[in-house]
Amino acid sequence: MRAEGTTAGSLADDADDPDADGADGAEPTPAMVDEPARSDGFVRGLSEAIGGPLGEHAVRPPRSEYGGSRFWTPVRVVMALALLTLSLHWVQKSPCRDGAWADLSQYKYFCYTDVLALYYAEHLNEGQVPYVDHAVEYPVLTGMLMGALGLPVHALNQRDPSLNPGRAFYNLNALVLGIFGVATAAMILALRRRRPWDAAMFALSPALFVSATVNWDLFAVGLTAFFMYAWARGRPALAGLFLGLATAAKFYPLLLVGALLALAIRTNRWRAMLYTIAAGTATWLAINLPVAARYTASWSEFFHLNRTRGIDWGTLWYIGEHLPLGGGRYGLYWFQRLNEDPEHGRLNSLYFGLFLIACAAILMLALRAPRRPRFAQLAFLVLAAFLVFGKVWSQQYVLWLLPLAVLARPRWGVFLAWQAAEVCYFVAFYGELMGASGHAVFPEWVFVFASILRLVTVCVLAGFVVSDILQPERDPVRQTYDDDPDGGAFEGAPDAGYLPLLRSWP
């Protein structure tokens, strides 16, 4: 993909070179490139098994004439790891790729994917066009992707009836989503040229391994990563374009505007953010208005479903509704009553109100912090709050948090604890699905406690991010960079003159 003469591949190549310009304009030297075995206590402890970190006076391999010190540079290693993880994910899903799901095999082998299930449920196998022929529960750009990949497969199947259309559709989607997954790793590398090993947290993520093609979320994750890169490089209009595209694919990228708003208030710098919002709005409208005008009922299905949807698996509200109380009793009465309203008005008001309170707290944190927080830190906190208090927390939503977690707090210890909790939830969720299908494999409390573990680890990770904001000298990114490599127009910006007045507000 080309953006103002720059390709995603060249971005990763830039990160390959330790002498490439840093985000703050300085030229990193090899000594300025972070080495986790030195800077991360968890990795340093693991490195003792192979002799410990590289010594201060160790001789590094000579640089080649092509700019890299050797072929397997950190960037190439990370990109290879991302490809490996996504390839292994494809293998892990292989028992389900033929679409012949019998005797709950899609749950027994942990290989269920909405991509294949919805190929038939949304009538893509019949050549129908999303929004035109029927309503789709996803935002417009995701529906367009479904149709753009489904129609060619249907046409091929018409010519060759021996083709398994479900398998072909899944494989094609896995390829496209894999490209966006690798592109996300490339964007993280481009944003962290002095910290290339941070991107390995994304590339090696167990959550990426188990969830990459459960749904089309990697499509929006990749577009969001492009948005963050364009913003960091001071291209607000291009950032707005990608923000509009990402929001047209999944609604969650819109939440990142809240982080930009908090930084704009703190610095009194508004122009770049307003350009981005304007470009994003124009892009979103250009994609949505034609569909909304001609196929209003189909277009509005996404909003109707989200408004009327009840308590979903694994959320805070599900935990309250099914909390084990002993004696075979489950659920707190007040939580159970929330799900009785067919329109779920009380539930919507409550979760949205709690989310707004959390956003207000994040804004106060951004204004009262001793140093301006980084964009990725605030973005992670806003999105984490949305998931913690939301009424839907699907297993693949972990992909939303992954890049932001890496950019917000690149420390392996807590990150791996969170990933372990996500894997526990993944396994428990498939057991829960089998139970819902009449083949119980464990008591309800097992899934409830897996849900609690996931929620708690996300909150703990958010707590560490808050701690880094309040004690910026502990922020690992600011130990490598002078300021915020993702900050864009806010990087190096002084606090607004009115900030002391805002801080004095109770």
Predicted segments with their positions:
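Multi-pass membrane glycosyltransferase architecture that uses lipid-linked
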Residues: 2-300, 351-506
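Membrane-lumen/periplasm interface segments of specific transmembrane helices
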Residues: 273-355
